[in-house]
Amino acid sequence: MLNNIVGLLDAGILAPTLSIDYLVIAGAGGGGHQQGGGGGAGGYRCSVSGESSGGGASAESSLTLLPNTSYALTVGGGGAGATTTGGTGASGNNSVFSSITSDAGGGGGSSSPGSAGVTGGSGGGGSGTGNNQINVGGSGTTNQGFAGGTSDGTVIGFGTGAGGGGAGGAAPTVIQFTTGGNGGVGVSSSITGSSVGRGGGGGGGGNGGVGTVTDGGGAGSPNSTIASNGTANTGGGGGGGGQVSDGGNGGSGVVILKYPDLFTATFSGGVTQSTSTGGGFKVSTITAAGVSDTVSWA
């Protein structure tokens, strides 16, 4: 009987499997120009039991994979902040692990003449408004993120830039002309062993003041200075530019994988990663990987 089992294992018929928990965050959107909307956070997908995915969703199921098989691995870069009047912040790039794809965060809108935020993993914020306009925030992807904020200029005739949506919450509507809108909140995960917040939306560009940002989101600019970038490898949105200033770049994404320490991961040449071991598991944090990169286990 044992010889039969060994033969089946050698033939790959009874090949062992491994269960992998993951946190996959996409690159975030860049902020808009000139009282621009904040960039939306990168899409957020998590399988750690008891934690949350983006968009208010519960944790997803872990993946069951085969050893000695290559699986796709990509870490999405953040989108560039807008540098010209009327130019929308660029959306980020998707992050991928095997069958899991997190959607890029949407770029923030720009004023003159004013534009809506871009749809994405989390949506970008609408730009500042004039002439009683309403510039809406972009929508977020279901189970990955929330919508960007809307700038409503119909109340007092003008509005500042609204914040980008976060993985953990939508950005609020802005109805005044001084302080830029708050970025949406992100989500915390302890997949690495300590709790870290990621996936915050970028703050909206203001006219003398800026709103709050958390979890890697970049602050909007209150004046003529360039807005802050989202934090690298958090999927935090770029801040919106203030009066005649540029938007900040979106933060790059990240892929974090937790698996039994009986297995060793092998990464293709374009991957930048670090691996720690403890409690019977290994945790690999991948901070850079191109569209053709892979990971396998043995």
PLM regions and their residue ranges:
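Low-complexity, glycine/proline-biased repetitive segments and flexible coils/loops
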Residues: L2-D10, L18-A298
